Amino acid sequence: MKLRRQGWSRRDVLQLAPATLLGTALNQAACTDKDQATTNSAENRINRVRRFTVTSKRWKVVGKNSHLDVHGDTATDALLIIDTTGGQQGFGWSRSNEGDAAELLDRDPLDFFQPGRGIVSPLGRGDAPLWDLTGKILNEPAWRLLGGYGPEWVPVYDGSIYFSDLQPEYADRGIPRIFEEIDHSLELGHRAFKIKVGRGFKWMAPEPGLVRDIEVVRAIRAHVGPDVKLMVDSNNGYDLATTKRFLKEADIEFFFVEEMFPESVEEDLELKGWIRSRDWNTLVADGESASEPEHFTPYIDRVAFDVLQGDMRRFGFTELRDLARTAAPSGIGLAPHNWGSYLGLYMQLILGRGIPNFVMAEQDPAHTELFDASDFELREGRMRVPDTPGCGLALRTERLADETLDWELHV
């Protein structure tokens, strides 16, 4: 079946009984590890919390999508660093405020870890720093604490193929400029690309915009050949009828189609049925704009999409792991939305090795020397997720002076 060749299928999710038993065993082991760590470090307390705004640099200027103007060449992350009296340090993305962070002070970090449930803390969804810290204290990778269901090598895609052909500085190159960006990413190891469409929503007249969208995706397919995965995302710049016309005239079996129109259960179901009627294996992906997990309930109940795309940073590890559990019996996978973040990629990768129904991680091509990511490796469209305790990244603390300190709390 083509979906299996591409790396993930609904059938994979329906064969999870052994993984569920494994997850139970891992949770029991985590309980034992937690009890032992608590015994050995009864006096370990959180004594310092800092939040920084971290700026990372893209190798290119990312252009427009259907709704927004040029996205630029930088991305920003909210970095929370937690230190303990025992000398451990956990860090990760979190927009938690000073009031919430103050409730961590003088607490045992392991008080917030509940095996089988996750991190329950004043940080709420901004739980990545505590997952990192808990893993380091227990000497376990965070992905194992999340369940350990996923593969060592997690599929990843380049999500940065925007409307470069419409940028004035590339006017003399047009579509070949997009080829340059793709070729660069292919050299880095990517084998999957998400292409923005919807030029006719705002930046061109509707008909010429649609024609250009079709021209671009056809040209990219011809350029990269049949073995590279392609996805499209209109950022709700189409309606259902335009989506069908685009897919029919492009005549490409995309791996998934994302946010093709403002999401609704009925229209997502109609698109799924129309795709199946053409004997395509293309998956329907949606949900990046959701702000609460309850948003997904009717979509999961009726299996209105194939891929759930709750935002990685908005929901965090614990809630996305819970959503994955809810979605798995319906054969729905997770490919969290991630844009405008360096740290978001590595959060997805940890989640991807932790849950059984993870589809692909989205990379924003941002980079910063603040973090050492050398334990991760990109090869042939997949990234190796290491066994390093915590979330796998190392912090170059000497470079923190180059970032903006938002606030600091200490005992």
Regions found by a protein language model. Name each.
Residues 48-53, 82-149:
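Metal- or metallocofactor-binding catalytic centers and their adjacent structured scaffolds
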Residues 27-64:
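C-terminal segment of N-terminal export signals and the immediately downstream linker at the start
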Residues 18, 44-56, 323, 340-411:
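Flexible C-terminal active-site loop/helix
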Residues 204, 210-339, 344:
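Catalytic core of soluble alpha/beta enzymes
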Residues 155-179, 239, 285:
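Active-site mouth loops of central-metabolism enzymes
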